[in-house]
């Protein structure tokens, strides 16, 4: 399969994720859209590394997945803290943790 198709798919996934981050108010949906954007970047890294015959992009994608796993743990803990305090999962309630 042509590597350009993977790059087009990556751009489409990143655009969908960015639109979700900008347009949605629910923290869980925004969180999933950020993860979609990270996966789109991983797909682009792997496609570029495949095009050039090197493993650098795949190594970067692996480390990005490790960072994304840590982000999931910390992000869900923050979301649960906000939900317990306000019984809402809205982006507007994120300023609750300032105090």
Curated annotation (Swiss-Prot):
Alphabetic keyword roster: Cell membrane, Membrane, NAD, Quinone, Translocase, Transmembrane, Transmembrane helix, Transport
Example of a GO biological process term: ATP synthesis coupled electron transport
Source domain of life: Bacteria
GO molecular-function term, one example from the UniProt record: NADH:ubiquinone reductase (non-electrogenic) activity
Top-level class of the enzyme under EC nomenclature: translocase
Membrane-related topology note: Multi-pass membrane protein
Enzyme Commission no: 7.1.1.-
Functional summary from the UniProt entry: NDH-1 shuttles electrons from NADH, via FMN and iron-sulfur (Fe-S) centers, to quinones in the respiratory chain. The immediate electron acceptor for the enzyme in this species is believed to be a menaquinone. Couples the redox reaction to proton translocation (for every two electrons transferred, four hydrogen ions are translocated across the cytoplasmic membrane), and thus conserves the redox energy in a proton gradient.
Family membership noted in the UniProt record: Belongs to the complex I subunit 4L family.
Subunit field text: NDH-1 is composed of 14 different subunits. Subunits NuoA, H, J, K, L, M, N constitute the membrane sector of the complex.
Name of the protein in its database record: NADH-quinone oxidoreductase subunit K
């Amino acid at each position: 399969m042509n590597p350009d198709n993977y790059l087009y798919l990556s751009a489409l996934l990143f655009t969908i994720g960015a639109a979700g981050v900008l347009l949605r108010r629910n923290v869980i949906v925004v969180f999933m859209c950020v993860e979609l954007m990270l996966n789109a970047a991983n797909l682009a890294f792997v496609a570029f590394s495949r095009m050039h015959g090197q493993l650098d992009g795949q190594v970067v994608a692996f480390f990005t997945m490790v960072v994304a796993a840590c982000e999931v743990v910390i992000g869900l803990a923050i979301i649960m803290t906000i939900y317990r305090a306000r019984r809402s999962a809205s982006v507007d309630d994120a300023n609750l943790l300032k105090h």
